[in-house]
Amino acid sequence: MEQKAFTRFNDEGVLILTLDVPGEKVNTLGQGMIAEFEAILDEIGEDDSVKAVVIRSGKPDNFIAGADIKEFTRISSAEEGEALSRAGHAIFDKLESARVPVVAAINGTCLGGGTELSLACRYRVATDDPKTSIGLPEVMLGLIPGAGGSNRLPRLVGLVKSLDMILTGRALRASRALKAGVVDEVCPRPILLDVATRAARGLAEGRLKPRRAGIPLKERLLRPVIFKKARASVIKKTGGHYPAPLEAIDVVRRGTATSLAEGLEIEARAFGRLSAGNVSRALVSVFFATQEIKKDAGYPKGTPARDVEKLGVLGAGLMGAGIAGAASTVGVRVRMKDATNEALGRGLKYVRGTLEERRKRRSLTRLDVGQRLDRISPTLDYRGFGRADLIIEAVFEDLQLKRRVLAETEAATAEECVFASNTSSIPIAEIAKGCRRPSRVLGMHFFSPVHKMPLLEVIATPETAPEALATAVGFGRRIGKHVIVVRDGPGFYTTRALSPYLNEAVWLLTEGAAVEDIDRAMTAFGYPVGPVTLLDEVGLDVAAKIGKVLVQHFGDRMALPPATDTMVADGRLGRKSKKGFYTYDGRKKKRVDETVYSLLPDGTKRRSVATRDVQDRLVFAFLNEAVLCLQDGVLRSPRDGDVGAIFGLGFPPFLGGPFRYLDRMGAGAAVGQLEKLRGIHGARFRPAAMLEDMAREGRSFHAA
């Protein structure tokens, strides 16, 4: 017999509906649950003993997480997307027009379709539990709220508040949701059912009248201004690459100017267009990829991992301090070592600064900041490292230095302690050469700034023990990172794939292209920053050093132009030296440092380069190297390559990652473009053998 999602209890006329989808950690709005809910609503309409209804969750920290996202992957046309949206409208229209008042009792996450269900209820009560959050994150999947949320929310709280929620996808804590008018009441978790039941009785008896702000008069008068500003803001932030926020603005604008029924029809058509589009499909694929890597971590299932309670960090620079701050935030005690008190002081100051940023945004209190800082103890020696579960080395990118600190660490730590290098390019096996415990050594490549960048690349050598790998991966997930596991090799995946992309930007500069034209072309393509700006952030000296490591292993395709050494010798190390391709004079708007051109061939004489030519050269250099990483076994799967590129390197999410993008264009088209570039620019554009094979056989990287 099929298990039911709902259980019922009639409390003297108030029907308590408890939603607990069987066999799932969270409640989702799947087809079976929706059908059962609709049948219950029909029964309520005919049952005079029911005077009011309370809907609550049987899950401990979740009300409803939203729709079953797998259903979105089955949409093959705009018409199918419209039908799915209209089905949601039908059930929530029935809920909204129910014979008796319905109260949503919200505890835990209430997102997407869960929020839309609550909006169709007469009254909403939420707990003040920290895990309670209410939001409409559909825009993050390239969609809009398609079950009535794009119409009901603005009618409830007004245009400005609803647009902010819908366009950002941000979820609100209960207190903010109350202030915004999204919920009607907030209470402690233990009394949620009592408060919701009392509200249901009050509504049924006419004693309780919910407050409804609606669309304020000021917003009605300023409608054109509000929508114009919202549209301009979206285009500025997204470059117009994401259609969902623009569709959302249009749906709210048109929907609130007509009846709810007509507004819902506008919403359904927009949802249909988006759900069948390439951007939504790409973003949904990224979502599933991030879920899959949590289950497939590159080591046997059931491998025991050390629970990291004490962490040692070697180096108090931006990376070391960032790692220490991330660890302390999740309750890990950190021992941070550097060579001088001055360096340690700068590291602690940096951590404090990142925490204070969060305090100013009210996501931390002063007490929280103090507790996190108290978990980090600075040191000039290895005292305290003997009790560490994991050591992360974040010293300068120098092989001999890294070998020395590894040897010192092994002498100061327990046998089972795991040692991780944060190197961005040096093979881990070379660092571990001659060490006493190679099975406990691996790489943990963080990205800067650590508190903002969501990727962690864990590098395993052939000798790395599964237990050590499990410990590193577990720690990475604990601090909130998307973790990919790659095989050891020069540059691993991310640095190796990024290098030809950055190199090509420098080659363009030596051929006469202007700095701003290159950066503008790549931000227009969808990258958050241009490659020349990124070189200034990384440091041209670092790029040159990495380039030399990669050339040793991969030959001339990784070579930077000779002018690179000239620029490094001139002290053009980027932001850190306040001298690079751009000026760093304290002004908000950066300017190109025109004097850099005197160090390049053709001097200050610049030529116009077509945006498409810039994009083709840089993007195909990147795509080809990504395929070579898969071909060489550095990457375990195309999925990992997509996740790594998007969350570590800024590859445009709306393209789904390099391998999804190649699937979309077709391997044959990619090989053709690479051959064209090879004919113009030389052997560095030679297509990967794997890509040529796939073109011949008509295969794709992903099954669907």
Predicted regions, residues:
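Conserved CoA-thioester-binding segment of acyl-CoA-metabolizing enzymes
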Residues: 1-56, 93
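Structural motif
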Residues: 14-18, 52-56, 103-105, 125, ...
